[in-house]
Amino acid sequence: MAPSQKALLVLVLSMLLTASDSRARRIDCTRFVYAPICRGVAAKRGGDSLSVGASTELDDALTDPFLRSEEPREEDTEKKWRELSRLSRVLQILLSHPTGETEQLDRLLTL
């Protein structure tokens, strides 16, 4: 092998080693947040997560009052029951009498 070929081979090998070494280094995303590797889905999938861990005590403190407010209260169910029975009476009267009696309908709706 000629000395120029050896020099060319060493140059190519050194370029390959430096290129592979520079690609292997990871960018510190805490310092370089706008680097392309630190943005988007690729950053979320790889490596360490910067998110805060789940706090179950805080979650419970926030969701418990909301869930309790969704439970039906006794006065709400009584009110709904009264409204349904009233609607049932109005429908029974309307179906049993011929149509065209607007005065009776107005009276029933104001009960």
UniProtKB/Swiss-Prot annotation:
Residues 1-24 form the signal peptide. Keywords: Cleavage on pair of basic residues, Disulfide bond, Neurotoxin, Secreted, Signal, Toxin. Residues 44-111 form a propeptide. Its main location: secreted. One of its GO terms (molecular function) is toxin activity. Disulfide bonds join 29-38. It is found in: Secreted. GO terms for cellular component: extracellular region. Expressed by the venom duct. Monomer. The cysteine framework is C-C. May mimic the function of prey elevenin neuropeptide. In vivo, intracranial injection in mice induces hyperactivity. Belongs to the elevenin family. Negative results: has no effect on six different human nAChR subtypes including alpha-1-beta-1-epsilon-delta-epsilon/CHRNA1-CHRNB1-CHRND-CHRNE, alpha-3-beta-2/CHRNA3-CHRNB2, alpha-3-beta-4/CHRNA3-CHRNB4, alpha-4-beta-2/CHRNA4-CHRNB2, alpha-7/CHRNA7 and alpha-9-alpha-10/CHRNA9-CHRNA10, when tested at 1 uM. This is Elevenin. It comes from Conus ebraeus (Hebrew cone).
